[in-house]
Amino acid sequence: MFRSHASGNKKQWSKRSSNGSTPAASASGSHAYRQQTLSSFFMGCGKKSAAASKNSTTIIDLESGDEGNRNITAPPRPRLIRNNSSSLFSQSQGSFGDDDPDAEFKKLVDVPRLNSYKKSSRSLSMTSSLHKTASASTTQKTYHFDEDETLREVTSVKSNSRQLSFTSTINIEDSSMKLSTDSERPAKRSKPSMEFQGLKLTVPKKIKPLLRKTVSNMDSMNHRSASSPVVLTMEQERVVNLIVKKRTNVFYTGSAGTGKSVILQTIIRQLSSLYGKESIAITASTGLAAVTIGGSTLHKWSGIGIGNKTIDQLVKKIQSQKDLLAAWRYTKVLIIDEISMVDGNLLDKLEQIARRIRKNDDPFGGIQLVLTGDFFQLPPVAKKDEHNVVKFCFESEMWKRCIQKTILLTKVFRQQDNKLIDILNAIRYGELTVDIAKTIRNLNRDIDYADGIAPTELYATRREVELSNVKKLQSLPGDLYEFKAVDNAPERYQAILDSSLMVEKVVALKEDAQVMMLKNKPDVELVNGSLGKVLFFVTESLVVKMKEIYKIVDDEVVMDMRLVSRVIGNPLLKESKEFRQDLNARPLARLERLKILINYAVKISPHKEKFPYVRWTVGKNKYIHELMVPERFPIDIPRENVGLERTQIPLMLCWALSIHKAQGQTIQRLKVDLRRIFEAGQVYVALSRAVTMDTLQVLNFDPGKIRTNERVKDFYKRLETLK
């Protein structure tokens, strides 16, 4: 379990292991159910329990005047611990109601057969299971080649012996069939055996417990599913077809916001289905970029380290390691993201190594190459110990020998502001006019936001970032909470863990701290990069109680909960003069509900962990409220039987970020300080994080610092576009 304790003015949590258990492993004892039928015994009850209704998600639209829409509840999110009833069968998918299970079973049997997908004229099919599956149902995506050579994607939902198939144009989430997710799985116990209604249930091996899911409360009417399929443009589809169907060695690029990441995700999914995940090497030039796409660094995958040895030495090193040798020989496709930061000399070495290791004189030893990135952004890092001059990848011999297609994407999605797009293109090519320079200077103005969330500041150096965040955090009143990560990593891999993750080892927060989300939440509108503000710190059980008392979370509720959180596990403080004065200062109409929560809070164990409750801004006057509990941040190390993982709350202070860490991010509110710019491409990377000029502030702009490499400009003039 996670244990909360206070020291002076700081509150911390740390992980305490008992019998090898993790936070998700703890669960309350189970209650026996009175079963009426055999089917309901195995399939669970049909009615929602009171506990389940507590976890329902509330949605509101602050702009709407319709009172009838203010209390809409979405399906409850099961909490995997603190459940007083057995979760072994109570949440099974496909369960029958207790009232008339035979009638429900007859409905299922009488359902007409579905033929909603086009039959394939070929025998070739590629299938891969999705991650969101439960024991009672399985979701799969299958790709078929039709007669017109078009790659079709079919999603199949299997439940025991029944199977439903949908084409990719059907929104599965809107259908009557409810797909199970990881959060709907019963909580697994690490005990070797248990009893339920007289049945002895045995577990043959220890099962890794599931991590707790967040207790959420959503106040937004525009709830969109993060799992809905992405529709590619014609330009993007042609890039995908060149790679997947025609097996072409491709480099594709484009300015910031042209959908390079969307194409990459699609390619990875389809190639993994076609060849199997083991045959696809997913790499990037940096640890942060590698984690984002679910891969590893190019240096780690290839096994050559920094690559400063001779080719003979590197080949010998690879041949001496069986796993490394197998990876080189059985890889069919090598994907490299952020290719602009890879030195061309390194690619030349890798190409020769590939041909020698695979004993194949084809380009790159017969491995298909998929390269992506933007050479107008951050360039390769020069190494002081190398005599060779750093060169761009497109200047390497490997590029001339291997790359068949170089494609420039032209459609911009991130910025819908045409004037901002013109400014970014001018900076990108280093062709500033007097009017554009004047427009950028006019962006040096303050911007007020109604929700109080300040714009994220970007700086060129890490020290500027640290000073800004520390200064703003110290200026806030109240207690400081420190959340220390639990790392699962051998000592020799600790540096990899630190450099590959945006989530910090120690996260220090206060009430009103401004934070950024570091995980995607598929069940709400939260995405990696969302901005929010910490409202208060509470336990999970107190959040459930709060939702019973208050239907929505407004400013008055925030004031109430900040008062309540002070007395969690501390009955003596409740009787103090200072607390009594603060309590009596609250409106009289709120005192009755406040006393209920206070009496509940003082009975909570002082050892129960408190977590930040955050208000996230997801649109104009639209918010999501979420209790941020620790989550896992895994890192895959190729060929290493090591599970690197950091467990930490998915937050970081975001008053300020470095330009380097911001690369690849979309930031809704941006304040850029260009005072210490030192590298070509930094200004472009910084400003291209913005979405619109209305939310962009630029300080210390100097046209003389806009530098573009002429070799990069010449290269981009020769790129092919797909219309």
UniProtKB/Swiss-Prot annotation:
GO BP terms in the entry: DNA repair; DNA replication; mitochondrial genome maintenance; replication fork progression beyond termination site; replication fork reversal; telomere maintenance
Effect of F42 to A/D: Reduces the interaction with POL30
Biased composition (Low complexity): 83-96
Listed InterPro entries: AAA+_ATPase, DNA_helicase_pif1-like_DEAD, P-loop_NTPase, PIF1_helicase, PIF1_RRM3_pfh1, Rrm3
Annotated positions of the Phosphoserine modification: S64
Catalytic activity entry: Couples ATP hydrolysis with the unwinding of duplex DNA at the replication fork by translocating in the 5'-3' direction. This creates two antiparallel DNA single strands (ssDNA). The leading ssDNA polymer is the template for DNA polymerase III holoenzyme which synthesizes a continuous strand; ATP + H2O = ADP + phosphate + H(+)
GO function terms (MF aspect): 5'-3' DNA helicase activity; ATP binding; ATP hydrolysis activity; centromeric DNA binding; DNA helicase activity; G-quadruplex DNA binding; single-stranded DNA binding
Chief place of localization: nucleus
Entry's EC annotation: 5.6.2.3
Signal sequence residues: none
GO CC terms, sorted: chromosome, telomeric region; mitochondrion; nuclear replication fork; replication fork
Binding residues annotated for ATP, in chain numbering: G254, S255, A256, G257, T258, G259, K260, S261
Family annotation (SUPFAM superfamilies): P-loop containing nucleoside triphosphate hydrolases
One matching Pfam family: PIF1
UniProt record similarity statement: Belongs to the helicase family.
Domain notes: The N-terminal part (residues 1 to 249) is essential for function and confers locus specificity.
Functional note: 5' to 3' DNA replicative helicase recruited to paused replisomes to promote fork progression throughout nonhistone protein-DNA complexes, naturally occurring impediments that are encountered in each S phase where replication forks pauses. Needed for normal fork progression through over 1000 discrete sites scattered throughout the genome, like rDNA, tRNA genes, centromeres, active replication origins, or transcriptional silencers. Required for timely replication of the telomere and subtelomeric DNA and for wild-type levels of telomeric silencing.
Subunit structure: Interacts with DEF1 and POL30.
Annotated protein name in UniProt: ATP-dependent DNA helicase RRM3
Organism ancestry: Eukaryota, Fungi, Dikarya, Ascomycota, Saccharomycotina
